[in-house]
């Protein structure tokens, strides 16, 4: 009892046996009882009175090969199932069955007996892991079962050195730093970064879901370089490595409002907007004039220059002309938003004809100026030559 709980030899009815020696196997994980009724018979074929024999058969743990996966340096626990209650285990130090690199910490042994199989192994390889094989002996009560194997796969821990990346403000960066592991994908989680200078960057956040790369879109709110310093945790094959530092260097994008200036014709002018990041450069398109064919000069500049400079000459003699440039600022590879530069080129009094006047000696003289000169023009008189 219970029914179908036992098997073995001598469990069925027998006749004319010289001894009573059944071999019974308990098929359950709890104790079973076999009730036999024995009828003795003498050599003269005389039958004696029947008598009972009751045999309690305790279970023996029968365990197939077990497998478990653990991370290097982490404790593992194995608890076989479908075994008799209060089964304990003993084992000796495991052996390394696969892997080129040594699995250390394998002096774990237990000769007294424990209810679970525990250990802590370290794997220093750079591949997918090594396997240590434990030979475990189960014991249920006083019944010792056959030894079985426990295969412990020890995964390596990813190790990543400090890494950094330079990115432009308002442009997403993505980085997958290389770990010490060979041909094994590494995932990353990270804490909220430390911003330097404080409050200079928008868009930074933590990420608790393992990602294949460190990626964010950060906005530098200043006109200078800013940094976001992340503490990143690498994860490979389900094992968590030591956190490392990742520094995102965010270059600003020059951002200027529209500018205007007024110049005299024929003289070079330069423009350096402020505030601006150092080493800002500029490109610009050819200007658009409000009066066509009224200005000489004004070319496009496709190659970045450290300042904006041109020479414009107003040929109208009397009307101010506006030149509108579309200017694109840059900081390194970071292109800012284009802005307009409106240059007003003043008209210059220009007289091509020789002006004459005849007066009597001792009397003042005046010279009538051309009508097409700029309003408000003033004149300076110098003696050039006296002829007789």
Describe the role of every protein-language-model region.
Residues 384-388:
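Conserved small/polar residues in nucleotide/adenosyl-binding loops
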Residues 1-4, 84-95, 99, 182-196, ...:
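Solvent-exposed loop segments of extracellular immunoglobulin-like
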Residues 48-58, 145-155, 241-252, 336-347:
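C-terminal edge beta-strand
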Residues 32-36, 130-134, 226-230, 319-325:
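Exposed beta-strand face motif in extracellular beta-rich ectodomains
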Residues 74-82, 171-180, 267-275, 364-371:
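A short beta-strand segment in extracellular, disulfide-stabilized domains
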Residues 60-66, 157-163, 253-259, 348-354:
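Proline-enriched interdomain boundary motifs that mark the N-terminal boundary
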Residues 68-74, 165-171, 261-267, 357-363:
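Short, solvent-exposed loop/linker segments at the N-terminal edge
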């Amino acid at each position: 009892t219970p029914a179908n709980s036992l098997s073995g030899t001598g469990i069925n009815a027998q006749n004319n046996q010289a001894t009573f020696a059944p071999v019974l196997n308990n098929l359950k994980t709890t104790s079973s009882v076999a009730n036999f009724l024995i009828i003795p018979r003498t050599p003269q074929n005389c039958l004696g009175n029947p008598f009972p024999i009751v045999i309690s058969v305790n279970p023996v743990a029968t365990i197939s090969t077990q497998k478990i996966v653990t991370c290097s340096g982490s404790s593992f626990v194995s608890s076989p199932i479908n075994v008799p209650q209060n089964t304990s285990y003993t084992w000796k130090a495991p052996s390394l069955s696969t892997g080129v690199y040594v699995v250390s910490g394998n002096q774990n042994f237990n000769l007294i007996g424990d209810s679970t199989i525990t250990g802590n192994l370290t794997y220093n390889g750079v591949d997918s892991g090594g396997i240590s094989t434990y030979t475990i002996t189960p014991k249920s009560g006083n019944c010792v079962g056959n030894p079985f194997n426990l295969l412990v796969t020890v995964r390596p821990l990813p190790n990543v050195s400090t890494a950094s990346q330079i990115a432009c403000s308002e442009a997403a960066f993505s980085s997958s730093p290389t770990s010490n592991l060979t041909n094994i994908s590494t995932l990353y989680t990270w804490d909220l970064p430390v911003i330097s200078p404080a409050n200079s960057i928008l868009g930074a956040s933590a990420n608790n879901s393992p990602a294949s790369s460190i990626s964010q879109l950060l906005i530098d709110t200043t006109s200078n370089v800013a940094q976001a310093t992340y503490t990143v945790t690498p994860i490979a094959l389900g094992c968590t490595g030591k956190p490392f530092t990742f520094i995102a260097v965010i270059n600003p994008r020059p951002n200027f409002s529209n500018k205007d200036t007024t110049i005299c014709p024929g003289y070079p002018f330069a423009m350096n907007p402020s505030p601006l990041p150092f080493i800002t450069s500029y490109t610009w398109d050819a200007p658009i004039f409000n009066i066509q064919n009224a200005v000489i000069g004004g070319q496009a500049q496709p190659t970045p220059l450290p300042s904006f400079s041109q020479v414009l000459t107003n040929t109208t003699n009397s009307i101010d002309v506006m030149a509108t440039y579309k200017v694109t600022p840059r900081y390194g590879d970071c292109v800012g938003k284009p802005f307009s530069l409106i240059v007003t080129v003043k008209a210059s009094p220009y007289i091509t004809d020789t002006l004459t006047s005849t007066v009597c000696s001792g009397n003042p003289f005046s010279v009538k100026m051309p009508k097409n000169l700029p309003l408000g023009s003033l004149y300076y008189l110098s003696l050039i030559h006296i002829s007789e």
